[in-house]
């Protein structure tokens, strides 16, 4: 589920994918894991 690099902002289901280090962010702040 990757439509764009900006989708991570409100993504919770795909958070795990972007959380690998592709984008800067903090778990629970910028994205959450289901």
From Swiss-Prot:
Keywords: Carbohydrate metabolism, Cellulose degradation, Glycosidase, Hydrolase, Polysaccharide degradation. Active towards carboxymethyl cellulose and 4-methylumbelliferyl cellobioside. It catalyses: Endohydrolysis of (1->4)-beta-D-glucosidic linkages in cellulose, lichenin and cereal beta-D-glucans. GO terms for molecular function: cellulase activity. It is an enzyme of class 3 (hydrolase). Its EC number is 3.2.1.4. It comes from Sclerotinia sclerotiorum. GO terms for biological process: cellulose catabolic process. This is Endoglucanase 1.
